[in-house]
């Protein structure tokens, strides 16, 4: 029997972008072939896809770390690397994806619905794309960007039209087995059902789905008895059917007391706003069950006379008495809910242009170090191959054009001060004069880094203060 898993925390990471290629065309009778290094491929995305054949999150529970394929590196002769394949993760219909703070990221309903949980990194540019009038044959290429990485909470909420709720051992499983082809485990003890069971019911021309929710107890809305785990499975239901055990022999139990307790739990449950009314305000039916027992029939008839706020049905899942009337009443609620369901809105395209006055980077001081933050500086550092002096010089040029060096000088940075960008620590050396002059010299070198002034060095910062490279369009 398949284990039912309806909540799991998953670590997802998009594939890294492929590195660009630094290559020079070498061909007979072509003395100035020029750069021909191709770009790296884009990393694959991690995508959740609704699959009707998937009913549990067991596979994600067993393998909670998922990573998409990286992009291939570029090659010479202007060959671009292949994009990494997307990682498609099948999930059940009704899956909700949240962040660790509980914010809903996606509500996946309907076969084929997708959500990109982690995007792959963009591929680095090859030296052919970096060539310019000033740098005709770059001896370096850009590294691929790392893919997005995050932890997400994946939950399954049953997609059903009708929810059967009630105390443990109230006969909900017997009822769904009697009105549908579902065959849940049935036994004469509480909490036999530990996972929701779904059954398809037909009433005339109306076909609908019923969910048998595991038994609720007092305090379920606060999590007692795994109530929170069970209650979220009825958030999508259009109507609620209260199944009341009229044969319960406990001294503190009665049909009316059980009904009031379950209604109170539904009213106290703070469900997510999925577009429907609160659970206790949805259409309700009351089923007084087990009337095949003489004492239970007497209790049911007495309780039915005191319930005036919802239709009441006296049924027996064993003898099937009253089931036909109950099924058609359920179908009527489903038909009304479907008729009143608002038409889905077409997707809206929202354009959010960047604010003109928003700075592209910020510099703050922390002790004797300077922290440079911003999408472009972080991304540029992540793309730089620090084993290549020409690539380091290119980074210095980009930062200088952005105004980072001027801002450091304005804040009083001195030679040798630590500057951290994107998790990489640099020794500030204004004598390099980045951004000016022409870096003549062999490919892969930059004469400015070997001048009389002490060279700038870089190493990974150990404090992890800055985030990984952010995504943005390539600049120059």
From Swiss-Prot:
Residues 2-159 form the Obg domain. GO terms for cellular component: cytoplasm. Residues 61-85, 437-476 are annotated as: Disordered. Mg(2+) binds at residues 173, 193. Its EC number is 3.6.5.-. Residues 160-335 form the OBG-type G domain. Residues 463-476 have a biased composition (Acidic residues). Signal peptide: none annotated. GO terms for molecular function: GTP binding; GTPase activity; magnesium ion binding. Residues 450-461 have a biased composition (Low complexity). Keywords: Cytoplasm, GTP-binding, Hydrolase, Magnesium, Metal-binding, Nucleotide-binding. It comes from the Bacteria. InterPro entries: G_OBG (IPR031167), GTP-bd (IPR006073), GTP-bd_Obg/CgtA (IPR014100), GTP-bd_prot_GTP1/OBG_C_sf (IPR036346), GTP1_OBG_dom (IPR006169), GTP1_OBG_dom_sf (IPR036726), OBG_GTPase (IPR045086), OCT_dom (IPR015349). Coiled coil: none annotated. GTP binds at residues 166-173, 191-195, 212-215, 289-292, 316-318. Pfam families: DUF1967, GTP1_OBG, MMR_HSR1. It is found in: Cytoplasm. SUPFAM superfamilies: Obg GTP-binding protein C-terminal domain (SSF102741), Obg GTP-binding protein N-terminal domain (SSF82051), P-loop containing nucleoside triphosphate hydrolases (SSF52540). GO terms for biological process: ribosome biogenesis. Residues 353-430 form the OCT domain. NCBIfam families: Obg_CgtA, Obg_CgtA_exten, PRK12296.1, PRK12297.1, PRK12299.1. Monomer. An essential GTPase which binds GTP, GDP and possibly (p)ppGpp with moderate affinity, with high nucleotide exchange rates and a fairly low GTP hydrolysis rate. Plays a role in control of the cell cycle, stress response, ribosome biogenesis and in those bacteria that undergo differentiation, in morphogenesis control. Belongs to the TRAFAC class OBG-HflX-like GTPase superfamily. OBG GTPase family. This is GTPase Obg. It comes from Acidothermus cellulolyticus (strain ATCC 43068 / DSM 8971 / 11B). The gene is obg.
């Amino acid at each position: 029997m398949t284990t039912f898993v309806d909540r799991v925390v998953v670590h997802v990471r998009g594939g890294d972008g492929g590195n660009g290629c630094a290559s020079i065309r070498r061909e007979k009778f072509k003395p100035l072939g020029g750069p021909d290094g191709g770009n790296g491929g884009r990393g694959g995305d991690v995508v959740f896809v609704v699959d009707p054949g998937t009913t549990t999150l067991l596979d994600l529970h067993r393998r909670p770390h998922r990573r998409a394929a990286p992009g291939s590196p570029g090659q010479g002769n202007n060959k671009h690397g292949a994009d990494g394949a997307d990682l498609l993760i099948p999930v059940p219909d009704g899956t909700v994806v949240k962040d660790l703070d509980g914010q809903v990221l996606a509500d996946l309903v309907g076969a084929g619905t997708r959500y990109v949980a982690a995007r792959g990194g963009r591929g680095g540019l090859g030296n052919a794309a970096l060539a310019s009038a000033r740098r005709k044959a770059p001896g370096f290429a850009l590294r691929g960007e790392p893919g997005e990485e995050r932890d997400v909470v994946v939950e399954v909420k049953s997609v059903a039209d009708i929810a059967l709720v009630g105390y443990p051992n109230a006969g909900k499983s017997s009822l769904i087995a009697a009105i549908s082809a579902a065959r849940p485990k049935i036994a004469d003890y509480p909490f036999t059902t530990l996972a929701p069971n779904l059954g398809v019911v037909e009433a005339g021309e109306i076909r609908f789905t019923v969910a048998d929710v595991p038994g609720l107890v007092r305090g379920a809305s606060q999590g007692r008895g795994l109530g929170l785990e069970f209650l979220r499975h009825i958030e999508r239901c259009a109507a609620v059917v209260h199944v009341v055990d009229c044969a319960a022999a406990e001294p503190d139990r009665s049909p009316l007391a059980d009904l009031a307790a379950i209604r109170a739990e539904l009213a106290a449950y703070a469900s997510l706003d999925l577009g429907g009314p609160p659970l206790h305000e949805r259409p309700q039916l009351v089923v007084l069950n087990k009337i095949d027992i003489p004492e239970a029939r007497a209790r049911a008839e007495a309780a039915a006379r005191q319930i005036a706020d919802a239709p009441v049905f006296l049924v027996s899942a064993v003898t099937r008495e009253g089931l036909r009337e109950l099924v058609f009443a359920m179908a009527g609620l489903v038909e009304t809910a479907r008729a009143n369901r608002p038409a889905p809105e077409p997707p809206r395209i929202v354009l959010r242009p960047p604010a003109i006055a928003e700075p592209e980077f910020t510099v703050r001081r922390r002790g004797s170090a300077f922290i440079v933050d911003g999408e472009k500086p972080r991304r540029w550092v992540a793309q730089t191959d620090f084993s290549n002096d020409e690539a380091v010089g290119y980074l210095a040029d980009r930062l200088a054009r952005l105004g980072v060096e001027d801002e450091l000088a304005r804040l009083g940075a001195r030679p040798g001060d630590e500057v951290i960008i994107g998790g990489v620590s640099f020794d500030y050396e204004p004598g390099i004069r980045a951004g000016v002059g022409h870096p003549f010299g062999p490919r892969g070198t930059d004469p400015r880094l070997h001048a009389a002034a002490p060279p700038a060095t870089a190493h990974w910062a150990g404090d992890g203060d800055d985030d990984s490279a952010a995504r943005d369009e390539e600049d120059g």
